Every structure is written in structure tokens, then in C-alpha cells.
Amino acid sequence: MNEILNVKGLSAGYGPLRVIHDLDLIVKAGERVGIVGLNGHGKTTLFYAIAGLTHWQRGSILLNGKQIGRTRSQGPGRYTHLVVKEGIAIMPQGDEIFHGLTVEEHLDSGAYTKESWKNRKEKREQVLEIFEPLKNLLHTPVGKLSGGERRMVSIGRGMMSDSKLYMADEPTLGLAPKIGKGVLGALLKIDLTNSAMIIAEQNVALLEGKVDRIIGMHAGKLKGEASASLSMGIKN
């Protein structure tokens, strides 16, 4: 399988604070990879570094074989346009949505490349096939939705671009267990024929049997990798 993501020797953080330490990670096309760990151990920082939203101290990141960004001297946001061009979609944790927009407007805002905007109606239909509860809510302001529905909109927005790598940051955070499992189940329906997915979670049990690999994360380092069926030994 082709490599979608190759992270090598990455150290990253916020200003002088280093959160990620000499981290290596390879994700191949068609893979679903779970990264599990407690809050504050670097899962979100890893996503932000890949997306160009925080500083690197050192290391390299290849997306589809192309170098993206280099050092902290570039500053956060300096190569995010390249990340978008290469096809990276980050689905942030929590309620990071535009409350004043309708569901339809919010979804369409995720079609930020010329090609995806041209095909936004088709992409939107694909999202609605996965998140069926949103079909009758297209003209409803996002701020009036339930927590589970808002999370569906947030993930759906990330699906609107022609992405090669999907990064979902704790998609079940703050949701009732039944709703969280439904959201996660829908997320896992995304076709990864020519793409890949990383899901960050605190609860390893949620990902067991649902992803190809589960990797533990502690103190900014990845450790304890196992197949999803053998992951009970991984400690958060």
C-alpha cells in the first residue's frame, strides 16, 4: 500500500514548550489507525503539527510523498495551504462549529478546494448517506442541534473536501455512550480506497475491532502498537 503519511523524528509544541518528542508514524492508504492516550499527552498537538497549526522544533512530515513544512521558524499556519492542497482534513474535538450557519452552509464550507466546491452537491449527498439524521436538518441553524448532531456536522464538514488523510480528534468526546458509538460507527463508514484515517481517543475499548492498528500515546511519544484485536495490553 502507498504511504499517505510519513512522520519522522517529529518534535513539536507551543512556543518553547515541547509536547511531541522525536515521534515516528507511518499510515498507509486504506488504513484506520487509532491513537489512544489521556488528555495532555500530545494527541491533539500531533494533529495540529501535521495540519501546520503549531510549531515544530525538528523532524519531517511527508504527505503523499511530499515534504510539508520544516521548522518552527516558519511559524504556525505558514504551510497550511499546502496541507489543504495535499488533502488533509482535521475533524477537531468538541463543539468547534459555526453556530450561526445552517447545516447545509456548514457542510459546504468544508468544500474549500476548487474541485470539491464544484462537486459539493455530490459530496454533500455522500455525507448525508452516512449521517442520515442530518437529511431533514439541512436548513436548521447548527446552534439549535443536539450535541450528537453537531458532531455529525463537524465530521461531515471534514468529509466535504477531497481528502487523502482524515484526522478525527476524539469524535465521541462529551457524547452519551450510545450516541458516541453511533457517531464513531458512521465515521468508520468513510471509504478509504485511496485515503487513510487517524482517530484519537481516550478509551481504547471504543476502537477495538474497528480499526487496523491501535497505538498508545504517553508524554508525547507513541508506544505499545498492536493490532486492534490485541490491544488490551496498551495502557492509556
Task: Report each predicted region and the residues it spans.
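ABC ATPase C-loop
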Residues: 158-159
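Helix-to-loop junction immediately C-terminal to a conserved catalytic motif
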Residues: 51
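ABC-type ATPase nucleotide-binding domains, specifically the catalytic core motifs of the NBD
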Residues: 15, 55, 81, 103-122, ...
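Catalytic Walker B motif of ABC-type/P-loop ATPase nucleotide-binding domains
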Residues: 166-169
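H-loop/switch region of ABC-family ATPase nucleotide-binding domains
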Residues: 201-202
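ABC ATPase NBD coupling module
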Residues: 68-89, 94-95, 118, 124, ...
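The feature captures the beta-strand-to-loop junction immediately N-terminal to the Walker
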Residues: 36-38
